[in-house]
Amino acid sequence: MACLLETPIRMSVLSEVTASSRHYVDRLFDPDPQKVLQGVIDMKNAVIGNNKQKANLIVLGAVPRLLYLLQQETSSTELKTECAVVLGSLAMGTENNVKSLLDCHIIPALLQGLLSPDLKFIEACLRCLRTIFTSPVTPEELLYTDATVIPHLMALLSRSRYTQEYICQIFSHCCKGPDHQTILFNHGAVQNIAHLLTSLSYKVRMQALKCFSVLAFENPQVSMTLVNVLVDGELLPQIFVKMLQRDKPIEMQLTSAKCLTYMCRAGAIRTDDNCIVLKTLPCLVRMCSKERLLEERVEGAETLAYLIEPDVELQRIASITDHLIAMLADYFKYPSSVSAITDIKRLDHDLKHAHELRQAAFKLYASLGANDEDIRKKIIETENMMDRIVTGLSESSVKVRLAAVRCLHSLSRSVQQLRTSFQDHAVWKPLMKVLQNAPDEILVVASSMLCNLLLEFSPSKEPILESGAVELLCGLTQSENPALRVNGIWALMNMAFQAEQKIKADILRSLSTEQLFRLLSDSDLNVLMKTLGLLRNLLSTRPHIDKIMSTHGKQIMQAVTLILEGEHNIEVKEQTLCILANIADGTTAKDLIMTNDDILQKIKYYMGHSHVKLQLAAMFCISNLIWNEEEGSQERQDKLRDMGIVDILHKLSQSPDSNLCDKAKMALQQYLA
């Protein structure tokens, strides 16, 4: 049975294969079972903490032989158990070791071992499985390939504290996404794991807690179930609250806070519940203090960011808890030159992971500033904050760049900040640089923020236009990613609002009529709505309306007709009728409507529609067409009277809707004048 390494065996590795390593493997083939057992035990002692020895034994083919012995019916239970222990030890080496074990199909062999009646052997197999499944190179799907595995693991939970610890650890590492959550939930994970929270073993309690955090994440079904689970007469949320008290280990506090956070975000616990406001939120803020380890501060800040993200009241409470906004500023000064860390290993680790702190701080600032103007002001006034965010936009880590862009996007929702801090720091410059070349996930947020910077009151609008934004945004509208198409067209819509004719002409030229009409037939509703919004903004002010309609009138009227005939919702049709109303406001452009009987019939149809919004939009078209003070109004009024429009106006003047009634009466006044 061959067992191949994914990476080629280098000569240097082979030269290091010692005679003693070969001797260990040779003993596995001894005809005397006792000698084989002793050989495996000696191998176990030789590989503990010795990665070089582990690599040597794998290269020499120890794994296939150990797996063969583990699966042989003639092997004693003691031998099988020792084989599982050695395999587990080999798995605790490098990621390459784990890959080699996976190549030899170790997982099916170990899962088969779980069917044994012997508890010690089962525990050894589970320990090895735990080590393999917690490795980043192991695909989680391998746990779910055989449908009998999960129910069997559930049954083994009652065997011992070790089976409980290892199985919960396997579940928490292999539960990635809703499909896995559903499988575990349907096989009774909640009921089977809940009572483990009161286990005498800390490790079991901890692994059970981790299980619940991954099961509840973004899962309303699991979260709603957890709220009502009783363990020894106590509800699960109450148990979680006890586990996040200050006297509990930090790991337990953090994981309990995550469970309650995920249940809250999934809608199972109210955001104003005391267990969130008075327990979970303060616990997570505590985790952000500089007394905590780097990974605790990262996890605390990221979990808190997730908890408060949709709720303005929680954002306000968090912002005034333990000086959180100032506390987060320390995330950017770590480790300091006079660091109190005396452990060199810890210092080396933290230097390598300091970017995770910056990422977490940006995420939490983004959540804190999502809604409240005062909080945004406090964040921006925190020492050098805008400089730090701008620096974050050019960091090498994609995750930090994404978090920095999200933070800026959150702060850019403030009219005041767009006019002041964003202008003072010329934020648009690094943002435009980010938009030139970034992964889609960053582009989506950066382009969304650009939409805010292009609002008409933003001082950044002019310099952004001068730096080639039109071409960049028109390029985004051709993206395969619908979110990028939406943002590209949205930003162009903002750019066109009350813009000069030159800017509007630039947009139309860069976008091209072909692309504009492709967007008008886009399957994504948001893209269609924003494209209609762009068209509406382009067709505003009479000279602009007449100019654009003189060059693009035929295509625009064609697009309007198609949308009004299509299966679109009320909002789409309302926006389209508003575009027609704008065209009807042009001096020469209105002729394109008056000479198009098909369009006139559609306007008439929508005047009698059951939905008031559409009736009002159609009324705007009619009002603009019949306005007395404009040249040719008499001919237009006569034509519309012949179509029966005046009769409809009389009916609408009796409408119970006051707005519609007033508009109809005003239109009738034009006929009487």
From Swiss-Prot:
The modification Phosphoserine is found at S337, S512. Coiled coil: none annotated. It is found in: Nucleus; Cytoplasm. The modification N-acetylalanine is found at A2. Its main location: nucleus. ARM repeats lie at residues 51-92, 95-134, 138-176, 178-217, 224-265, 269-309, 313-352, 374-413, 416-455, 458-497, 501-540, 543-585, 588-627, 634-673. The keyword Magnesium does not apply. One of its GO terms (biological process) is proteasome-mediated ubiquitin-dependent protein catabolic process. InterPro entries: ARM-like (IPR011989), ARM-type_fold (IPR016024), Armadillo (IPR000225), ARMC8/Vid28 (IPR038739). Component of the CTLH E3 ubiquitin-protein ligase complex that selectively accepts ubiquitin from UBE2H and mediates ubiquitination and subsequent proteasomal degradation of the transcription factor HBP1. Identified in the CTLH complex that contains GID4, RANBP9 and/or RANBP10, MKLN1, MAEA, RMND5A (or alternatively its paralog RMND5B), GID8, ARMC8, WDR26 and YPEL5. Within this complex, MAEA, RMND5A (or alternatively its paralog RMND5B), GID8, WDR26, and RANBP9 and/or RANBP10 form the catalytic core, while GID4, MKLN1, ARMC8 and YPEL5 have ancillary roles. This is Armadillo repeat-containing protein 8. The gene is ARMC8.
